[in-house]
Amino acid sequence: GNAVMMNYYSALDRGNEAIEDGVNLRLPSGSALPWGNRDYDVNLVVADKAWDANGQLWFNPFNTDGFLGDQILVNWQYEPRLKVRARSYRFRILNGSVSRYFRIALVREIAGNGGEFPGPSGSGVSYSRVPFHLIGNDGNLMEHAVPFDGSMDLDGDGDKQNHNAILPTQGIAERFDIIVNFAKNGIKTGDKLYFVNLMEHKTGKGPEKNGLSLADVLSEKYKAVIKQGSKGPEWDKGDPVVGKFMQMIVQPYTGQDVSMNPADYEPAKPGKAAGKKMIPLTLDRDNAADMVKVKAARHREFIFGRSDGTDEAPWTIKTDGGFGYDMDSRRISAAAQLST
């Protein structure tokens, strides 16, 4: 749906940032049309692809270990470049791959060595992180706009920097909506920014356990190369889909950016109380009575399994610790009931 639909809703997400009625969140979009403006609301379908020796798209439908391409496309464009104006944008990033996971970062290129991370040896450039806010996911808008700026320990591991300008791992068909302001954080007209993939795959069965570091990828300490193998050219020393995959070039903006400031909707963090809510949750995690309801609710566990052999049940689902069954449309393992 993200690739073909407008994804606009009648109240909160109007697609017109100028409407100030106390309901519309005024997300970056534009204001020329009554609703559904897309000037500053951009869909990005990110996917890996492969081509054969004749330049034709190639795919192996019999590969049950997960298909991996060796090139990354955005909206079916190779090495895309997007001119952006010096203002806020909303990017709806969808993982359109068959088997590949992504871990996407945003950086700005800086002439010389004044950036946080050095570029490749002899390149004459360095890079700095570009903070942004995560405002939505597969379930559409979230309760708060989460800052990816190093101000919060987002995964509770004690390290605030591992999500500074770096999104969480993004699974197949998973969507992240972010707001980037191209007029803040030292960004100037003419600057070049890049989306960077930090997630390595060695097989299609799943990504490597830990994502790669921005320092290693931007310096090209980690960089796949082509070598001649027994069957012809092949990739060596890494995953070719790791690295920069989309460039944005900042253009001047003479208009007035009237879209919302996501910082006003941030969750509570050290030294700052919680801001406004975009979508109030049905259950309040700070309400003891609501948490009692959650504990009293019935919890189910589904475990999806796969065998490495060629037995009669290569794909199975276990329900609540039971047996692993293969697909049978006549069997009901979990029948949800209202208010349970």
Regions picked out by a protein language model, each given a short descriptive name:
Residues G1-A18:
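Hydrophobic or amphipathic alpha-helical targeting/insertion segments
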